[in-house]
Each structure stands twice: as structure tokens, then as C-alpha cells.
Amino acid sequence: MKKILLLLLLLSGCHSIVVPDSFTYKEIKTNTYKLASWQKITDKKSPVRIYIEGDGYAFNHLGYPTTNPTPHSTFLREIAFTDPNPNVVYLARPCQFVKDERCSVKDWTTGRFSQDIINSATQAITNISNKHHIILIGYSGGALLSGLVIEQNPKLPVKKWITLAGVLNHTKWTDDLNLPPLKDSVDLKKLPTISQLHLIGDKDKTVSYKLTEKLVDNKNLIVIPKATHDKGYTNYLSKIYEK
């Protein structure tokens, strides 16, 4: 029987979501942060597909930083929880879904891609993979974080990188939207050269598909007609779920 996850009962104002019984909640403690994850691991020989969440509820509708970055959108969780592959993990970003004394507003604003954040994600991914091959699927800011993990850890056995509505360079992204720079964050020097696929909607107002077109090879890009930042991907799930 399916169970209703109420975001660990720690949060308010967020959407609940039905989590399949095949997924188990695990809190991963790294040297810097605690990370929430939901894991389905059923085949020791298959790659582990790790979905990395976006920046979440970092700013309110007035543009001010929030006190809790846990995502209100269930977009990525829904995709992860319906992935039919045997080994699937949804990995939240630091400070999402958990109470962690280490967290500060900087961790989901100017420092959302800091070295401490990257190190924490790397430790969590290494812990989850347990020497399995890895497919990283990053959504929005999670795309850049996953790219940074790949860039800084060439020995990590990542066989494929998939991004959904992904920020691929935060300097160019903030410039494109005329936003303040993320002064406490690390940026990608160049995109990884591993097998990759980038999906983005042509109606996405958070990340411009035109910017993505400038950054990735056309053969690795799918621009989805009428898709927004968190809607319109249903007909392309098979591309995401490919091994």
C-alpha cells in the first residue's frame, strides 16, 4: 500500500506526494550537511540513477530569501518515483526536507554551489552508488550541481549525465536574467565530456532554452514544445528513463 509523505512532518505550506512503498527514506550525513533521500535499490548489477533536486523554494514571490528551501514543486519527485528502472534515488539538496544546524540562507542563495555544497553532494552520491555505475539526472540548479560533481571527481563512475530545465553555468544564467551574481558559488569551467542529454522547454521562463542552445551540442539537446520549467515533460519520460 502506498503511503503519504508529508515532507517528514517538519514542513508547512508544501505539497505532499504519494511515495511508492518501493522507496525508502534515508538521511545521509556528510562531513558538512545532512541530505534527504528516497531510495529504491533492487539490482546490485544495474546502474544507480540519482535524481538531484533543483534550488527549491529559495526565494518568495516578493524576491526575498526564504527560511526553508524545501521545494514546493513535486516535479522531480514525480519523475523519480515513476522511474521503472531497478535502482533509483531521489536526492534532495542540502537544507531541503531536513533540520540541520549547519544550514544558513547563503546555502540556498549566493552559495548554493559552494565548495562545501559540492563536497556534500559528492559524498552522498559516492555513498549511494557503492561502486555501481551512476546516471546523474539534475533538475534546474541540480543540473549544475551534478555537473560540478562530475567535473571535480573524474574517477566517479558516472556513465551518463541528464539535465532537465538545467542551469549549466550560473554566471551566464544570472547575466541572462539580470540577477545578482552567485558570489559564493563555484561555476563549471566547461561541460563534462561524458554521454549526456539535456531537455528543456521552449516556454521555460526560469532557464532560457536559447541560453542552453549556446552551451550544449545540438545532438545532445531536446527542446520540448510548450513545456515550462516544471510542466510538459510527460511525453519525454522515455528519454529520461533510457539506460
Where in the sequence are the language-model features?
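Gly/Ala-rich beta-loop-alpha elbow adjacent to hydrolase catalytic centers
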Residues: 137-146
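Short, surface-exposed "cap/lid" segments of acyl-processing enzymes
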Residues: 31-36, 41-92
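The feature captures the conserved acid-bearing segment of alpha/beta-hydrolase catalytic domains
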Residues: 166, 171-231
